[in-house]
């Protein structure tokens, strides 16, 4: 798959990366639309995103693969990335801001400035009927 990989100094390069493969409890989403979030703009403007990172967390797409044990989703489901309620055992689920994550811009996590995104089963949110994929990408779930 292709991805816009941050090179530092406010520069991106389009690179070929391996397609993600879902492990148990994971899904792969084919990205249809990705908004440019203010967080991403600031990460680039102030050069705080690590070299090698793939940004983009406000997006919509279609589930293209499901890992073993996934029950909530099937191939073809339309979703937005992030914002789903985490399981109570996850540290970020404990407290009133359950959607707040402490991961920053990890280089090992490929986000939606790529053609495909790997997600935990609990992360996506279904796109309601009548909402376009372009509109859904703008909802900012997280």
Each predicted region: which residue ranges?
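Residues that act as N-cap/strand-start positions at coil-to-secondary-structure junctions
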Residues: 13-14, 47, 111
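Glycine-rich beta-strand-centered segment in the early N-terminal region that forms part
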Residues: 18-34, 45-89, 123, 128-131
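Short polar catalytic/cofactor-binding loops
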Residues: 8-11, 34-36
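NAD(P)H dinucleotide-binding glycine-rich loop of Rossmann-like/cofactor-binding domains
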Residues: 85-142
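Short structural boundary motif marking the start of a folded domain
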Residues: 1-4
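Cytochrome P450 core scaffold surrounding the K-helix E-X-X-R motif
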Residues: 39-44
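Short beta-strand or tight-loop elements
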Residues: 10-15, 59
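Short Gly/Pro-enriched turn/cap motifs at secondary-structure boundaries
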Residues: 7, 18-19, 50-57, 105-109, ...
